[in-house]
């Protein structure tokens, strides 16, 4: 669905003809995909904000874990980046950027109707079509540089209906992991 400029070319009692002049904006991705990402340094975080917006996430949740070095987010700069990326990718609405959350609080308050997809460096499981259902709300969780601690991993893997999956045989930088994970989830979702 998109917004368009229209010109009415004919009005009669039983019909109206319109001419499409130009498409204005593409409606956002119909999937509700959230990105829960552990905070990283400024430049990679800006890339994460930009690329996740371009790839259609509806919400970005900055996470602080035991091994997260950065503890806060410049919200003014973050909003500017997602607004620019929204315009560049011809979408209508920028993603919501939530307040920074501790990992344990994020896991505790995760909506029961949202499926948690854990991009896990230790997983050998490939995300498949039967792991995601059309219309299902999804939250992709990506860890910090140095990965989650063993206790955090255990907490994540005990979330009901969590799906742990691999995104690469290599260890990826956070910004590369975000692009890869969102692209993979979008691909699987739209082909399910």
Predicted regions and their residues:
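Generic structural signal for helix capping and beta-alpha/helix-loop junctions
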Residues: 69-70, 126, 174
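Active-site/ligand-binding-proximal alpha/beta "capping" segment
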Residues: 110-154, 161-166
């Amino acid at each position: 669905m998109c917004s368009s400029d229209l010109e009415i070319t004919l009005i009669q009692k039983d019909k109206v003809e319109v001419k499409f002049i130009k498409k204005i904006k593409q409606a956002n991705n119909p999937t509700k995909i959230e990105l829960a990402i552990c905070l990283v340094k400024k430049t990679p975080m800006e890339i994460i904000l930009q690329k996740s917006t371009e790839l259609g996430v509806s919400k970005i949740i900055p996470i602080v874990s035991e091994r997260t070095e950065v503890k806060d987010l410049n919200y003014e700069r973050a909003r500017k980046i997602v607004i620019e990326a929204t315009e560049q990718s011809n979408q209508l609405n920028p993603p919501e950027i939530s307040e920074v959350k501790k990992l344990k609080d994020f896991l505790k308050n995760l909506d029961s109707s949202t499926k948690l997809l854990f991009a896990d460096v230790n997983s050998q499981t490939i995300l498949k079509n039967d792991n995601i259902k059309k219309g299902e709300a999804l939250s992709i969780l990506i860890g910090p540089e140095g990965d989650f601690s063993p206790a955090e991993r255990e907490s994540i893997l005990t979330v009901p209906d969590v799906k742990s999956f691999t995104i690469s045989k290599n260890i990826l930088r956070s910004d590369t992991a975000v692009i890869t994970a969102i692209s993979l989830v979008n691909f699987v979702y739209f082909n399910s």
